[in-house]
């Protein structure tokens, strides 16, 4: 037993080193060397070993990122050195004045600056003791911040242990939400009738102040760290060298910074980034300029509010005035009615803008938006066009107040507003708009990725009665497509090939494509990898679901409700019969013998060495099948602690009952 325990300990330590190495490759170097599936395999193996040997669990284990308990609140914690805000510069003149002040304090000395991107997020502080992450906090008022350690640990870009055992290090940076995650989050909130986040910064701040860390974990946040706040021991001599050292420690820094020898170089570098800021996958609202020499920083010192050795250059907000030509309603795949303003086209943030979402009736009323109004338009977080305000003083008397329809503009059914939600919804489950938007979502790039099946052809197929739901797509024939507008022989053949190819997509893609409320792309992948098959997910209990990291009660309830409906069960059955993949393939270094091929298992009770999902995965990897109920077709019932009625039924039917020890032996058979 001692040898076995030592082997487990050695394997756990090796797995942690390997997982941390891959985190460093992915988040710090941006050079991943393994697939997501291979990474998940390593994590699952580590989880299994730690469940069997809880004495081996350590605070810095990659498995400890998402805590299970909901917090009651956040306590205040002091910063060792105040987290001061920066003074602002709004033009070239302000930058040159900053340079003049710096040089007046350092007469005759060479001054170099480091210029960095100003990430539009939430300022955070991380404490490491002997290389281990022990605390994470917000900036707060600069003197006191909020302890949000449990939420910051869910961000995979933050290392739980550094590559070197530094006695004490406080490092400061910015937590942010990528643009694509912000768009998906707001789309999901809009469909759910929840208030929208105004920009990625607010979304990041709101996500980090969640009392339930599972919600934070599902929000796909990231970080860039940009400075040493406090350190026990010697600092590198310059800010640029500090950034390089932080990177060596495994801390993620932004690579797009530059050392400049003059204020002219600073201004040139800022101009370059002002022109290409919209190409970034995250929002920036300016640039930060710092004196490079830490010794010079020390002599320059600070005022009561901000350091003398740094300044933030703020990009001007890109806004434009347009006319609201009309307000139209779009019905989404969950029945939400979303008003959209049709605008006179204007140039904004590098694109032509002709539409702006108005989100819901409340926002239209709050801003008193009318058809015909002159409106100030900007892009929220440089992404989504929005109306900031209208100009009542410019009204001519011909403007028309907008009234949300009481019936669905697509099907004529009653529209209701659910208590506690901002959204109005169509009450018709068979609304044609819901079907259309559901199919468009199903074929989208992040879901089943069926190239060539755009909104136009989907509308034609629906109008022609050929397609009512996603399963109908797999019944389409060449003759059906060639008759559609703008569909020639070649495009019809290519589309049929794309539909056929989509049958081999991952289970995660299919789950996301089904459009289950609150189940985003990330949650779909997690569910697919955890359960391994559609059948297993459909049989999952609420307890099974909420026991998964990043799956909270709201998602669990939505999944249970979706699979309880007969029409959805029928849709999945038809997709399966059409040949659509219902399994999540796991990449394995060695092929597993199919020793359980054709055998049906039921697992009941609590197993010591396996979670329910792990036991199921082990059976399915060997060719077996797992059922949620005992019948005459069941071959084995695996019994853990507190098994319940399934154990009794198995005895009555004379089915072979396996203890956990028996089950392990069966799995080990060659």
Curated annotation (Swiss-Prot):
It comes from Desulforamulus reducens (strain ATCC BAA-1160 / DSM 100696 / MI-1). This is DNA ligase. Belongs to the NAD-dependent DNA ligase family. LigA subfamily. The active site is at 118 (n6-amp-lysine intermediate). PROSITE patterns: BRCT, DNA_LIGASE_N1, DNA_LIGASE_N2. Zn(2+) binds at residues 408, 411, 426, 431. GO terms for cellular component: cytosol. NCBIfam families: dnlj, PRK07956.1. One of its GO terms (biological process) is DNA repair. NAD(+) binds at residues 36-40, 85-86, 116, 139, 174, 290, 314. Its EC number is 6.5.1.2. Keywords: DNA damage, DNA repair, DNA replication, Ligase, Magnesium, Manganese, Metal-binding, NAD, Zinc.
């Amino acid at each position: 037993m001692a040898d076995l325990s030592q082997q487990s300990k050695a394997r756990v330590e090796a797995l942690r080193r390997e997982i941390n190495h891959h985190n460093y490759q992915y988040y710090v170097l941006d050079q991943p060397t393994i697939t997501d599936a291979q990474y998940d395999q390593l994590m699952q193996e580590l989880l299994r070993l730690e469940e069997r040997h809880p004495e081996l669990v350590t605070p810095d284990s990659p498995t400890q990122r998402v805590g299970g308990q909901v917090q009651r609140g956040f306590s205040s914690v002091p910063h060792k050195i105040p987290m001061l805000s920066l003074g602002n510069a709004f033009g070239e003149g302000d930058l040159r004045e900053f340079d003049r002040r710096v040089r007046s304090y350092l007469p005759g000395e060479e001054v170099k600056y480091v210029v960095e991107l100003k990430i539009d997020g939430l300022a955070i502080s991380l404490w490491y003791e002997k290389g281990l992450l022990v605390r994470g906090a917000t900036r707060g008022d600069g003197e006191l911040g909020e302890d949000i350690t449990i939420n910051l640990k869910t961000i995979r870009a933050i290392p739980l242990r550094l590559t070197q055992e530094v006695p004490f290090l406080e490092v400061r940076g910015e937590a942010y939400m990528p643009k694509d995650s912000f768009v998906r989050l707001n789309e999901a909130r809009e469909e759910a009738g929840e208030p929208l986040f105004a920009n990625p910064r607010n979304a990041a701040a709101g996500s980090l102040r969640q009392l339930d860390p599972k919600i934070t974990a599902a929000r796909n946040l990231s970080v860039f760290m940009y400075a040493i706040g406090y350190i026990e021991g010697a600092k590198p001599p310059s800010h640029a060298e500090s950034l390089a050292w932080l990177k060596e420690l495994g801390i993620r820094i932004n690579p797009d910074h530059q050392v400049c020898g003059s204020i002219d170089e600073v201004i040139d570098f800022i101009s370059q980034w002002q022109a290409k800021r919209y190409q970034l996958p995250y929002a920036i609202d300016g640039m930060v300029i710092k004196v490079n020499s830490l010794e010079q920083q020390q002599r320059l010192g600070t005022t009561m509010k901000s350091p003398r050795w740094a300044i933030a250059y703020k990009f001007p907000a890109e806004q434009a005035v347009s006319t609201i030509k009309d307000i139209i309603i779009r019905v989404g795949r969950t029945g939400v009615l979303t008003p959209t303003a049709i605008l006179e086209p204007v140039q904004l943030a590098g694109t032509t803008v002709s539409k702006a979402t108005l989100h819901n009736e409340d926002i239209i009323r709050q801003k008193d938006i009318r058809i015909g109004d002159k409106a100030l338009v900007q892009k929220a977080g440089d992404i989504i066009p929005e109306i900031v305000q209208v100009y009542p003083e410019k009204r001519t008397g011909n403007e028309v107040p907008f009234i949300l329809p009481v019936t669905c503009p697509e099907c004529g059914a009653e529209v209701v507003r659910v208590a506690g939600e901002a959204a109005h919804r169509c009450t018709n489950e068979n609304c044609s708009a819901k079907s259309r938007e559901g199919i468009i979502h199903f074929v989208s790039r992040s879901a089943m990725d069926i190239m060539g099946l755009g909104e136009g052809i989907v509308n034609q197929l629906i109008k022609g009665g050929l397609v009512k739901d996603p399963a109908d797509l797999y019944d389409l024939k060449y003759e059906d497509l060639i008759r559609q507008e703008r569909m020639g022989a070649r495009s019809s053949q290519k589309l049929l090939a794309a539909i056929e190819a989509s049958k081999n997509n991952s289970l995660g893609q299919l789950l996301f494509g089904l459009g289950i409320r609150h189940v985003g792309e990330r949650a779909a992948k997690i569910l697919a990898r955890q359960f391994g098959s559609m059948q297993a997910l459909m049989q999952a209990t609420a307890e099974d679901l909420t026991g998964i990291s990043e799956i909270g009660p709201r998602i669990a309830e939505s999944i249970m409700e979706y699979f309880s409906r007969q029409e959805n069960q029928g849709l999945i059955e038809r997709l399966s019969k059409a040949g659509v993949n219902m399994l999540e393939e796991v990449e394995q270094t060695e092929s597993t013998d199919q020793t359980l091929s054709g055998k049906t298992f039921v697992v009941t009770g609590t197993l010591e060495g396996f979670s329910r999902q792990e036991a199921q995965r082990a059976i399915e990897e060997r060719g077996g099948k797992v059922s949620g109920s005992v019948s005459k077709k069941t071959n084995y019932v695996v019994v853990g602690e507190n098994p319940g009625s399934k154990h009794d039924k198995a005895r009555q039917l004379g089915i072979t009952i396996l203890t956990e020890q028996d089950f392990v032996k069966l799995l080990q058979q060659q």
